[in-house]
Amino acid sequence: MQIQPSMYINRELSWLAFNSRVLDQCSKDLPLLEKLKFIAIYCTNLDEFYMIRVAGLKQLFIAGISTASNDEMTPLTQLKAIRNYLHEEKYVVEQYFTKITQDLEKENLFIRSYEELDEDLKQQCNDHFFSNIFPVIVPIAVDATHPFPHLNNLSFSLVVKLCDPMHPELLKFGMVRIPRVLPRFYQVSSNIYVPIESIVRHHTEHIFPGYKLLSSAAFRVTRNADMEIEEEEADDFMMILEQGLKLRRKGAFIRLQIEKGADEQLIEFLSSHMNIFHKDIYEYSILLNLPSLWQIISNKEFTHLLNPVYTPKILPPFGDNVSIFSAIDKQDILAIQPYESFEPVYQFIKEASKDPKVVSIRMTLYRVEKNSNIVQALIDAASDGKQVTVMVELKARFDEENNLHWAKSLENAGAHVVYGITGFKVHAKVAQVIRKEGDKLKIYNHLSTGNYNASSAKIYTDVSYFTSKEEYSQDTTTFFHILSGYSKSRRLKTLSMSPKQIKERILDMIATEASHGKDGVIIAKMNALVDGDVIKALYEASNKGVKIDLIVRGICCLRPGVKGYSENIKVRSIVGKYLEHARILYFKHTEPNYFISSADWMPRNLERRLELMTPIFDEHSRAKLAQILKLQLSDNDLAYELDSEGRYRKIALNEAEKINNSQQILEEYISRIFNTLKKDTDHSRAAHLATKLFRDS
């Protein structure tokens, strides 16, 4: 089957459409600070997109590479399309932010400039400036003897045009660098926040004494943060990575954000020194550095402007005074975060670290929080003499420094730390505990779609699978041997791993459904669908009559609903208060027919990373996955549907139609089950009843 370029949606534009769906949450009937959250998330996402994706396209363009992607867009045409998209969307961001801040004022929560304050509050700002701001800000002159300074990625500064009152014709240009140690806003009272640049601007003549301020503008820079490491040539990978992190701080400037109405001479001064394209300059009529809005969102006096806090539940067979290993020994257990608590995952490692019967702990770490209880448990286990092997992925983007810290701490405690296989990132999420029971060794496993990170587990939807079945244990053992030793074989028997094996298995299962024609069914939930071979296979299956439902939160390069290609394919995206992160697959004619995976359907996951795909044999666990997919396919509140033109549309409801919010329903389901079973002391019986209640809800 020949696939026309028009049947592929551009990857970068599809990502921008996803971020637009994040921004679109501001149009919904949400508490005001929840809307402010989505603006902060949107801006943070966009920062990373520019640092990596736009930076990469620019490098290709500068290198003279004009190779087109599957959709026949060259690096230059993609850059033009991205800029056009974002310059248009800038106005949408401004409108949402302005409306939200106006509505917050009705709730007695204000963002005020220095000039808008009364005299008492101005004096308080003055005192704060001289006590806390003036000692740490950095005034910078730029002239023949003062070169243009180094500006850190995402740094926030004030650019100024000055003159000596005695010689007003002699213009001076300079900057005030605002260190990150200073909060973005000064909370001058419990309900009033003053942007720091407003206070600094008012005191410019104290910063540059004897000079008159002619004009000023707040600005923010973005640098290329993509980092290439020649692993094959590295004798000490940790040292090479540390050097790479230092070099990344000096990446080329790729975006300038500046206040709207800024003096043209100031813009020219910055852009000429940064060597930045004019179309990569974004002028905003609202505040800059909006990822820092979390400072306001976290105000404890305005929690009524947030969603009610949901407390994740611990369901049977887990519970107080229940051994993790005893529970897993009796049955496989599938948990869904954040509806179910992440605590059993932590307890799995903590109990292993203290259990005298445990002889070995192995696990992978990709993204962990700065104060990780899980890593501390591993350190404790290693310090106590247990055999601890940890695969720390040092190349996890923007977590490199944190992972370096933990790798060194683990090594110092006596753990065996490995950094994976040359040329591949290790993205699989797996932990293994080996326990001496009688005269035999028993292996317990945890396989997951999400990171070992208690912080992200509160806001990311993921699936955890605990099992002690031998067929899984054999494969997890092989997987860890591959990571820590030499192995030319990278194939597993029950689990599938990438590179290669997961993709082969997926293509085989798609082909199996295609062979069943109209009786074939595929349901796949993931973060991104980019791989051209998989997309082609899905088109071919659709042409054979297979019913295909795809739940793709982010990038989707497949174009659904096109006659002769994809009329049997539907694509939807779920965007809500939790970030959909789980990968769940269903193939009707495969046994077993449910899978969870750490891998998205992207070339990088299927060909350039070590990932795991886990078949789910356990009936109760499959029932849980089936209900999750059913709920998400019936969601008409958080869901957007992708049409054949590549546009995402909200689902239109008639007046009689009931609103189905899959995330809210899952909260209610899990809470109902928890409340029904919390007094049942027979944890095994309660676990089976929990599955039945979930399935029948």
Swiss-Prot record:
It catalyses: [phosphate](n) + ATP = [phosphate](n+1) + ADP. GO terms for cellular component: polyphosphate kinase complex. Mg(2+) binds at R367, R397. ATP binds at N45, Y460, R553, H581. An intermediate of this reaction is the autophosphorylated ppk in which a phosphate is covalently linked to a histidine residue through a N-P bond. It comes from the Bacteria. The active site is at H427 (phosphohistidine intermediate). Its EC number is 2.7.4.1. Disulfide bonds: none annotated. InterPro entries: PP_kinase (IPR003414), PP_kinase_C_1 (IPR041108), PP_kinase_middle (IPR024953), PP_kinase_middle_dom_sf (IPR036830), PPK_C_dom2 (IPR025200), PPK_N_dom (IPR025198), PPK_N_dom_sf (IPR036832). GO terms for molecular function: ATP binding; metal ion binding; polyphosphate kinase activity. Its cofactor is Mg(2+). Keywords: ATP-binding, Kinase, Magnesium, Metal-binding, Nucleotide-binding, Phosphoprotein, Transferase. One of its GO terms (biological process) is polyphosphate biosynthetic process. SUPFAM superfamilies: Phospholipase D/nuclease (SSF56024), PHP14-like (SSF143724), PPK N-terminal domain-like (SSF140356). HAMAP family: Polyphosphate_kinase. Catalyzes the reversible transfer of the terminal phosphate of ATP to form a long-chain polyphosphate (polyP). Belongs to the polyphosphate kinase 1 (PPK1) family. This is Polyphosphate kinase. It comes from Campylobacter lari (strain RM2100 / D67 / ATCC BAA-1060). The gene is ppk.
